[in-house]
Amino acid sequence: EWHIQNKAKFENVGQWKRPWYYPINNEGLHEAVQRESKAARDSAGILDASTLGKIDIQGTDASEFLNRVYTNAWSKLGIGKCRYGLMLNEDGMVYDDGVTTRLGENHYLMTTTTGGAANVLSKLEDYLQTEWPELDVYLTSVTDHYSTASICGPNSKKILKKIFPDKDFSDDAFPHMSYQNGKIDEINCRIMRISFTGELSYEINIESKYGKSLWEKCIEAGKEFKITPYGTETMHLLRAEKGFIIVGQDTDGTMTPIDLQMDWIVSKKK
């Protein structure tokens, strides 16, 4: 609703319509992307990342399950930590990727690509039922349960501090690739320090029914820093400059991690 009111242009991504860019006055795509990306690099930008696939993973064998479906190791990931994972097909070609967070001893939250969420869940369920039925693991799709606002840029930490005044956002207390619980107006939320732009970034997850309120609160907190909403086109630019891949855009089903110069994420010990 907020995106429509602010005249966002939309594009189809998977089963969703995502804000493509936010033109001001008579801006075209190129002009809007240059403005949005400069704001994200110089001060602060905000992206609606709600459409990323989210799979709740629970069970005593959850760590072992992740160890089997991703190319890298997962058994030693600490509670409250996040890790990027790459998923391959049986033929060794890149299938999907995303960041998974360890919420508890036997509890993880996996994110997938927007377009791949349903297929990834289906594949994981298939593995559990046919390949590894002995594993104690339960999967639940929670993509539409949570709204996600991603705030990035040099001033993102200052904006988060305004939203969560009682929380310590220092690098020691809240390092990169970690997660903490928080509250906004007594509503529980999850805060992840994750970056898809190369800039300092935080993602806030909250129940979907509070998504618009969260977005408006972030915009209000970021006003003094001229926080700028940006769409998928700017996201593609920022992540490409950093060297991050998007499965389905940089891959076509025939790409291996080595083709993508990502052999660093393939464990040699399992």
Task: Give, region by region, the residue ranges found by the protein language model.
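Acidic active-site catalytic centers that drive phospho-/nucleotidyl reactions
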Residues: D48, D97, E203
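Conserved hydrophobic/aromatic beta-strand scaffold that supports enzyme active sites
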Residues: I46, K54, L86, V99, ...
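Short amphipathic beta-strand starts and helix->beta connectors
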Residues: R35-D42, M87-D97, P133-L135, K183-I191
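N-terminal glycine-rich flavin-associated loop
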Residues: L47-D61, T101-L109, T148-I151
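Conserved, structured C-terminal
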Residues: E1-N12, R18-W20, G28, G104-H107, ...
